[in-house]
């Protein structure tokens, strides 16, 4: 039996027959099919695009009062809490947000002179 004949035989098998074949090969040769699959899955996970981002206020810049107002609008914090966040920059403003939301927040803050990082 050559390689092509083996492949044709495998193509003709049902899922249950393939499952039995894999188990028989594992037993016969003392290997597991799970190890290579886990390695491939791990590589694929690393290649996936990041979906959650953190918005970090790096510095307030010259227009601190305007930045405090925008921080209040974004976070829903009170005046005192928003001022503390701005005074203690670099500070995370929002964590685990979508890329679009992170870019929107970054744009709002940069418009009033703040320096912002999206991580």
Curated annotation (Swiss-Prot):
Pfam name, any one: Ribosomal_L12
GO terms, molecular function: mRNA binding; structural constituent of ribosome
Organism classification: Bacteria, Bacillati, Bacillota, Bacilli, Bacillales
Any Gene Ontology biological process: translation
Gene3D superfamilies: 3.30.1390.10, Single helix bin
An example Gene Ontology CC term for this record: cytosolic large ribosomal subunit
PANTHER family xref list: 39S RIBOSOMAL PROTEIN L12, LARGE RIBOSOMAL SUBUNIT PROTEIN BL12M
Physiological role: Forms part of the ribosomal stalk which helps the ribosome interact with GTP-bound translation factors. Is thus essential for accurate translation.
Keywords: Ribonucleoprotein, Ribosomal protein
Domain of life: Bacteria
Protein name: Large ribosomal subunit protein bL12
